[in-house]
């Protein structure tokens, strides 16, 4: 896969992650006053970064030794990385057991919307470039 295809694919996948994150943040905000509600968050970026670094390292043809010693261990490629929703059980912000901080969630909401807008612009630019090349 060339760098253009990879960047388009990553931008598309990241838009899906941002949509999921938007939904999770909205759920947190909607339950700000629900007793014992635990906030959730979406994790994706750290695993994606690790997978990309692993792919780069394997593309450098590093000497790895005997693969039989890995006992079936397979490093994840960036296409294998999936977003995950994690519940925050450890923190308690209010006496009713709820741990949603509305200010933090609103900040996360705005930040997520800005990143989503940026990546939609990146996708539009990629497709505009392809359209120019085709013409």
Swiss-Prot record:
It is found in: Bacterial flagellum basal body. The keyword Nuclease does not apply. The basal body constitutes a major portion of the flagellar organelle and consists of a number of rings mounted on a central rod. In Gram-negative bacteria, at least four rings, L, P, S and M are present, whereas Gram-positive bacteria lack the L and P rings. The rod consists of about 26 subunits of FlgG in the distal portion, and FlgB, FlgC and FlgF build up the proximal portion of the rod with about 6 subunits each. The lineage of its organism: Bacteria, Pseudomonadati, Spirochaetota, Spirochaetia, Spirochaetales. One of its GO terms (biological process) is bacterial-type flagellum-dependent swarming motility. This is Flagellar basal body rod protein FlgB. GO terms for cellular component: bacterial-type flagellum basal body, rod. Its main location: other. Pfam families: Flg_bb_rod. It comes from the Bacteria. NCBIfam families: FlgB, PRK12622.1. Structural component of flagellum, the bacterial motility apparatus. Part of the rod structure of flagellar basal body. Keywords: Bacterial flagellum. InterPro entries: Flag_bb_rod_N (IPR001444), Flagellar_basal_body_rod_CS (IPR019776), FlgB (IPR006300). Belongs to the flagella basal body rod proteins family.
């Amino acid at each position: 896969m060339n760098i253009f295809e990879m960047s388009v694919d990553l931008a598309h996948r990241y838009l899906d992650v941002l949509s999921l994150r938007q939904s999770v943040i909205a759920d947190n905000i909607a339950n700000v006053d629900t007793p014992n509600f635990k906030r959730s968050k979406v994790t994706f970026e750290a695993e994606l970064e690790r997978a990309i670094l692993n792919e780069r390292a394997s593309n450098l043809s590093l000497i790895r030794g005997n693969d039989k010693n890995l006992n079936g261990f397979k490093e994840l490629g960036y296409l294998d990385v999936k977003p995950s929703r994690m519940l925050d059980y450890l923190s308690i912000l209010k006496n009713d057991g709820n741990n949603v901080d509305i200010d933090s969630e609103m900040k996360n909401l705005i930040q997520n919307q800005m990143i989503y807008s940026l990546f939609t612009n990146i996708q539009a630019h990629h497709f505009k470039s392809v359209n120019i090349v085709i013409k």
